[in-house]
From Swiss-Prot:
Protein name per the record: Large ribosomal subunit protein uL23
GO biological process assignments: translation
The keyword Cell division appears for this protein: no
Protein purpose: One of the early assembly proteins it binds 23S rRNA. One of the proteins that surrounds the polypeptide exit tunnel on the outside of the ribosome. Forms the main docking site for trigger factor binding to the ribosome.
Gene: rplW
Oligomeric form and interacting partners: Part of the 50S ribosomal subunit. Contacts protein L29, and trigger factor when it is bound to the ribosome.
GO molecular function, a single term: rRNA binding
Short name of any one Pfam family annotated for the protein: Ribosomal_L23
Signal peptide interval: none
Entry-linked InterPro entries: Nucleotide-bd_a/b_plait_sf, Ribosomal_uL23-like, Ribosomal_uL23/eL15/eS24_sf
Gene Ontology CC: ribonucleoprotein complex; ribosome
Amino acid sequence: MSATQKDPRDIIIAPVVSEKSYGLIDQGKYTFIVDPRSNKTEIKLAIEKIFGVQVASVNTLNKQGKTRRTKFGMGKRKDTKRAIVSLKSGSIDIFTTVG
């Protein structure tokens, strides 16, 4: 592995568990929280390597962290990046294996 390649497990942080993401699974689209510094090509290669599926497209969105009032003044939650991954064929068994 060269110095420019990242480990796929460092790129894909976690699946998004929400009502909207469950609805997208029926369309063959899966939503993940990813490293904010990663690009669409890195996300595609990481998904293909981890889950062994063919990726058709990757859509990304950056979510700004909310500003919240705390006991010590104003604080800010961290910014996150999400990726919506469309598959050519097959499926990912992320949510069915949870006990």
